[in-house]
Amino acid sequence: MINHADIENIIGCKTLVTDRMQRAIEDWYDAAINGLPLDKNPETLTLDLPALICAELARLTTLELEATVEGSDRADWINTRLQRVLTPRKRRIFTVALALGSGIWKPYQSGNKLGISFANATRYFPVAHDVEGSLTEGVFIDTIQEDDSYYHRLEWMHVLERRQDLRDAELAQLEDYDLAAPTQFPCIKVVNLAFRSATQDSLGSPEDLSIRPEWDEIEPVAYLTGQETLPVGYFVTPIVNSVDPDSELGAAVFEPARRQIIDADEQYTRLDWEYEGGELAVDTDEKFLKPSATGQQLSKAQALKEYGVPPEAIDHTAPHHRERLFHGINVNTGITDSTPFYQVFSPALRDGSYLTGLNQYLRNVESHAGLSFGVISQVADVEKTATEIVNSKQKLYATVSDLQAALEDALRGLINALDYWADHIPGAPGKGKLNIAFKWDDSIILDRLTEMAQWQQEVSMGLRSKAEYRMHFFGEDEETATQAVQAIQQEAGAADILKGVLDNGDG
């Protein structure tokens, strides 16, 4: 990750990224993306719980997600581009946003087309927000690697409500490019700068934008008029940022369970050592492992004949798995050549206790990460009361509901950004009505059969109508549901009449 201080030197002001937050983002990246243990101990084996937690919450949050924009030709144009973001393949990037605390969907113009890029927390530096929390200034980084060089393009976007909002560094840049200050407000000043470096995490030396053919037609400075916030979809995780409570940036969704994840990894390391330390072995004097007086390696046939194992299994210098079957002990045992000595090492494993302990550690992780029991632990191993089960599911429901609300807010921001860019793309439809609808899966806390049973009871009590029941569970509109209920009632009435006739006839 490029140091925030280097970005601040270029734009002439502080970003919202502090030293503490940058270290945290890099730490989250190492844990969730690179799979390194949170305790930084190379001897610790990791269960990859940060990645697992992020992937599972991303799946539950976007499960059956439907977002549509309708109502006009402009709405259809926006909806087509929005659906590209919502494809299952694209949803995977939401996992990265959960892992690093935030992410931004940013439309960009490429000729007569409009693309949408995603920047995770290592690829953008927020500078300022307005009172409603919308981003008003930020720096985005686009990196291209070729051979041993890294080419970085910085896109600095700043909302200006009046000329006085221009800082000294910005005025100096305008003079460097011999450009006048903007005359229409509000507007967004967009500055593009190119750099070349030998490493991915440093800016390197300034270059012209023409150094890359992809950037050759990009203007160094441009103005986007009529916009009071950056045209982006800005997602921030809705959890307490325990790393820096005063920061506007989000935290990784697994950060509240950091200590518990470390405990679980340590317990998993103990369990692995229990299995490795308990591997079958045979202890014997080293001289009985020497294949000959000259120390020459036995042939495969000799080894199989004398020991019943391949020659590598009696090499006491290779201590792994099958190759550690024989242990050479260099001690004076007093054993003669005619009386071989060996002792089988086959201890009883204590994995049951370790597994029980590990499962409890995993439950602690679930509790602190806002998950329900059984997402990563084994629920069958622990007896729980009905109240514990309900409370656990409610915790997950609250976590996912908060994430869905934050994601919906970001997607609405993206829709507004697409609506803004439609005014600047040749051939895009003119202004029109935008009917935005979101549909989320709400069956996390209550399974389908339980919910149906509850509704059926409410229908029998007269609290709901049969038409409401069909509309909710069968997806019918009110007219279709009402007609279906009437048809069923008529059929039931006809059946009653027929039964009465048959009963009278029998009498």
Locations of regions flagged by a protein language model:
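Extended, charged amphipathic alpha-helical segments
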Residues: 204-391
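Extended, regular secondary-structure scaffolds
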Residues: 99, 104-251
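Flexible coil/linker segments and helix-coil junctions enriched in charged and small residues
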Residues: 32-36, 75, 163-182, 292-315
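Conserved aromatic-histidine-acidic binding/catalytic patches
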Residues: 13-16, 29, 45, 58-62, ...
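Extended, helix-rich architectural segments
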Residues: 1-151, 163-166, 301, 379, ...
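Alpha-helix initiation and N-capping motif
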Residues: 4, 71-75, 87-91, 254-257, ...
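Short amphipathic alpha-helical segments
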Residues: 74, 81-90, 97, 256, ...
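C-terminal helix-loop subdomains that flank or include functional centers
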Residues: 303-341, 345, 349-507
